[in-house]
Amino acid sequence: MKIFIQNQQDKVDIDQHISKIIEESIVNTIKVFLEEENFEISVLIVDNSFIKELNRNYRNVNKETDVLSFPIFEFKNGKLLEDIVIMEDEIPLGDIVISIEKAAQQAKEFGHSLEREIAYLTVHSVLHLLGFDHIEEDDRKVMREYEEQILQSMGLTR
C-alpha cells in the first residue's frame, strides 16, 4: 500500500508521529474492508483557509471543515460497485484533505489529543472513500460503529 502525505501549511507543526498515525489509521481502516493491499491514498495536510476554499469549490459550502474526501471509485459501505481495470501496480482509492488547524481546535474543544483527533478524521475520511456516509441516521450509526471499532483497535478511545 502506498500512502503519500504532503504538508501544505505552517500553522501546526507536523512531525513523524502525526504522519505515522495517519498511515496507521489508513491501514487499519482499509484492512477491515479490503483483502488486497495494493492501494494508494494521498493525504494533503492544510490550514483552515485552504480547506474552506476546497469546500466552497467542490461542495458549495463556504466555510471551513475538518476533512474532505475525494474518492476515485464508487463504493457502498466498503464494497466496490464497479468493475475496474487498472494497469498500474497500485489502485488509487482517492485523496484525503485534512485541516490540521481545525483538527487542533477540535482536539482542544473535545478534550483529547491532537493524535486522537487526526486518527479519527483519517478513519472517517477513509470510510468516505469506501462509500460510507452519515446523511441518514442509520448510515451514521453504522459509520460511527466502524470509526469506534477501528480507533479502539489502535488503542485510541475517547
From Swiss-Prot:
Zn(2+) binds at residues 124, 128, 134. Its EC number is 3.1.-.-. Single strand-specific metallo-endoribonuclease involved in late-stage 70S ribosome quality control and in maturation of the 3' terminus of the 16S rRNA. The keyword Plastid does not apply. It comes from the Bacteria. It is found in: Cytoplasm. One of its GO terms (molecular function) is metalloendopeptidase activity. SUPFAM superfamilies: Metalloproteases ('zincins'), catalytic domain. HAMAP family: Endoribonucl_YbeY. Belongs to the endoribonuclease YbeY family. It comes from Caldicellulosiruptor bescii (strain ATCC BAA-1888 / DSM 6725 / KCTC 15123 / Z-1320) (Anaerocellum thermophilum). This is Endoribonuclease YbeY. The gene is ybeY. GO terms for cellular component: cytoplasm. Its cofactor is Zn(2+). GO terms for biological process: rRNA processing. Its main location: cytoplasm. InterPro entries: MetalPrtase_cat_dom_sf_prd, YbeY, YbeY_CS. Keywords: Cytoplasm, Endonuclease, Hydrolase, Metal-binding, Nuclease, Ribosome biogenesis, rRNA processing, Zinc. Binds 1 zinc ion.
